[in-house]
């Protein structure tokens, strides 16, 4: 039995699954949040098994919710240290499900929102085996000390009206990825705040379906 909280998941329409989609929620939420997106996208991704793990820590600024790491101090070097300390626990959750489904990183798609994007991008950059692709909604990139993976394509999606994580963070992430020559795209969505809408989901679906993960 897993040492982490049991989380929601949705089986692929086609069996056995060929891909694993890992949904990483924002701070103060939990896995039940992003699993609610699956009914809107699963018909376009019929060979994908979806999991939405709960953050590995209790949210430390409210009596409910989960977090991937504390945001009480948002200094980049502090956040990087906290992520580095916790990233192996996130990897454990993913690896356990990969083993159950007989899949590997090259079959795995990471989708994050807000703090989930922060953990998802960091996770992607430190892998020794590339993920299929990574999508980040409304988040920021906290660079790791060492980048092991430059092969995973990354898609960044951000609302121009976001006042929680400003759209400037998308451009900061894009500049960082460009310097490392990592394939990526950025999409600024008009009239959207800190949220995911149908336009963003369509971009994500197209991005996933345009990947040829098995060739990586």
Swiss-Prot record:
Keywords of this entry: Hydrolase
Active-site annotation: 114, 162, 194
Keyword Hydrolase carried by entry: yes
Domain of life: Bacteria
Gene3D superfamilies xrefs: alpha/beta hydrolase (3.40.50.1820)
EC top class named in words: hydrolase
Transferase found in the keyword field: no
Pfam families: Abhydrolase_2
Documented EC number(s): 3.1.-.-
GO molecular function, one term: hydrolase activity
Family of the protein in this entry: Belongs to the AB hydrolase superfamily. AB hydrolase 2 family.
Protein name: Uncharacterized hydrolase RC1147
């Amino acid at each position: 039995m897993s040492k982490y909280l049991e989380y929601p998941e949705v089986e692929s329409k086609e069996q056995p699954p060929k891909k694993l989609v890992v949904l990483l929620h924002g701070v103060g939420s939990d896995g039940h949040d992003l699993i609610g997106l699956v009914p809107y996208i699963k018909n376009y991704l019929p060979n994908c098994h979806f999991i939405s793990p709960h953050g590995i820590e209790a949210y430390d600024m409210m009596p409910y919710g989960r977090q991937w790491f504390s945001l009480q101090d948002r200094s980049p070097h502090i956040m990087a240290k906290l992520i580095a300390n916790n990233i192996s626990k996130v990897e454990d959750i993913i690896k356990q499900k990969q083993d159950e489904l007989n899949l590997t990183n090259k079959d795995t798609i990471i989708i994050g929102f807000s703090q989930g994007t922060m953990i998802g991008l960091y996770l992607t950059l430190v892998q020794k085996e590339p993920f299929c692709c990574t999508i980040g909604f409304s988040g920021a990139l906290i660079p790791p000390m060492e980048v092991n993976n430059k092969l995973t394509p990354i898609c960044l999606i951000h609302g121009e009206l976001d006042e929680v994580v400003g759209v400037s963070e998308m451009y900061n992430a894009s500049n960082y990825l460009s310097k490392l020559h990592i394939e990526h795209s950025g999409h600024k969505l008009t009239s959207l705040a800190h949220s995911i809408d149908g336009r963003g989901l369509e971009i994500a679906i197209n991005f996933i379906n345009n990947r040829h993960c098995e060739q990586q």
